[in-house]
Regions:
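Conserved RNP beta-strands of RNA recognition motif
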Residues: 62
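Short S/T/G/P-rich N-terminal loop/turn motif that feeds into the first structured element of a domain
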Residues: 1-43, 47-58, 67-70, 93-105
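An amphipathic, aromatic/His-enriched active-site/gating alpha helix that lines ligand/cofactor pockets
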Residues: 65-98
Length: 105
């Protein structure tokens, strides 16, 4: 990953079984429309690196790279009314171990 491509974030979204998007036509439509906006997000500098669903936990893990935090928030905005989310800035383990290299200290 190139730093000029932006920071990397892991977005963690969850919901209760009762408000699971898979339980209603409206919820499924919302989730499908959200996911279909990936191309628009890419045009705004939000690159999806990976995305996983833990279906039995009602949880999504979406790793993104973004230059603009506001564009990142706009991408995830459709989830906010029915999901609980957290967006964590992260670095790779390789980058981190270089940073804490005891030979540098």
């Amino acid at each position: 990953m190139n730093d000029s491509d932006g920071m990397v974030f892991v977005a963690h979204w969850t919901h209760t079984p009762e408000n699971c998007p898979g339980r209603s036509k409206e919820g499924a439509t919302m989730l499908n429309e959200f996911w279909a906006r990936r191309d628009l997000a890419a045009k705004k500098g939000v690159k999806i690196l990976s995305a996983y669903v833990a279906a039995t936990e009602h949880t999504y893990y979406i790793t993104v790279q973004a230059k603009d935090y506001q564009a990142l928030l706009e991408f995830f905005e459709p989830l906010a009314p029915t999901q609980t989310g957290a967006i964590h800035p992260v670095t790779t383990m390789d980058e981190w171990t270089k940073h804490i290299d005891p030979k540098r200290k």
